[in-house]
């Protein structure tokens, strides 16, 4: 039995008003689908106004549109969140996945192709195909306990802490040399 810590809401998503990169565009494609199909996912970010989202020349009003947020607000009370990096790469990941993991919120994620090597078994994987991804998100909403990942936030903190990882990045010998100079 998978035990879920108490969180008052199921799923969130963060969007900006940017559309230059592939991740920006895919966020807006997902958001359009979510809002037009009335899927119960709360939306945060500068790409929205409290209660209002503009898309395809239309304005959509919804109580699910929360607007700008404080750093961890879209994660603390949510079991799941949708995380889409601005671009895909082999080893780059950002606060888009770090903040949810530190909040013990399971990310549905696309971006870093090798994310499992950094955060094994902590991530649900989006594909970039709107139909497959919406199917996954709807299944998560129907059966949260079946998809929830138990996240060791201490291990996440260790993985992303620059101070703890400096010797891994530069090697212990390089650190000793720079101290002696």
Located regions from the model:
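Pol beta-like nucleotidyltransferase catalytic core
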Residues: 1-44, 54-83, 88-181
């Amino acid at each position: 039995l998978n035990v879920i810590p108490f969180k008052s809401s199921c799923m969130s998503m963060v969007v900006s008003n940017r559309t230059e990169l592939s991740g920006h565009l895919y966020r807006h494609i997902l958001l359009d689908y979510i809002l037009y199909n009335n899927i119960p996912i709360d939306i945060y970010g500068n790409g929205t106004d409290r209660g209002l989202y503009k898309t395809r020349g239309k304005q959509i009003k919804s109580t699910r549109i929360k607007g700008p947020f404080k750093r961890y607000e879209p994660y603390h009370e949510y079991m799941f969140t949708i995380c889409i990096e601005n671009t895909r790469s082999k080893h780059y990941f950002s606060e888009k996945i770090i903040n949810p993991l530190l909040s013990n919120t399971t990310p549905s994620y696309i971006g870093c192709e090798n994310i499992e090597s950094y955060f094994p078994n902590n991530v649900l994987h989006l594909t970039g195909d709107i139909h497959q991804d919406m199917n996954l998100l709807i299944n998560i909403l129907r059966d949260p306990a079946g998809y929830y990942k138990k996240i060791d936030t201490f291990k996440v903190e260790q993985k992303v802490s620059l101070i703890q990882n400096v010797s891994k990045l530069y090697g212990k010998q390089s650190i000793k040399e720079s101290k002696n100079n």
